[in-house]
Amino acid sequence: MRYAVCANGAIVAEVAGGRTLREVSIEKDLVLDLYRRVRDLPITFDIFADSTVYTERARFSLIDELDLSDATKDFVRSVRTVYDGSFEDQLARVGNVCRLNVFYRRPEDRDAVCVLIDDVPTLRHTSSLPCNIEVTDSSAHKGAGLRWLCDYLGVSPADCIAFGDGDNDRTMLEAAGDGVAMANACAATLEVADHVTASCDESGVGLYLAPIFSAIASAR
């Protein structure tokens, strides 16, 4: 893999060289204001910055209570760095914030957070799990990241195939010439897909690409 669109399109990276080619950050004043509005809710408020996911120690145990498989919860814990002290101090220590993540248990907490985000024109939210909210700058999403990378490489998005199953994949499927939803995709992603392949557990990406690669090889 040479390039990666990360953090819901907020970062485009050259993997081999370890270079960040593009980063769209959230203003720290907005991050702090949003945190202060939601801090009394039983949620996490994770900061994505400096290639690290920072989670407040007092909120880390909420992951245990999420309606997720044990394997998914183990993964979520493994990619987080717990910090002590105040959120304000931690925010001041880190570099650019490219994304925020909120885990919640109750629908009313989700709704309360989303209403606040919707009130800020420069923010957007999406999700990849049934219990999370992913927040980026309004211009940062996977579709925008794909289009930027295509422009950087001199490739037309019309010649790209994109696969996805979450709501956060929807803009990417719309941007690509062939947007392919996994069979296990959420309804919003299935709705915008050009095609549907087998589920993630059934190796849907490989099944879809195999005949395409075979046809390319035969044409040479």
Enumerate the language-model features and the residues they cover.
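Alpha-helical substrate-recognition element adjacent to the catalytic core
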Residues: 1-31
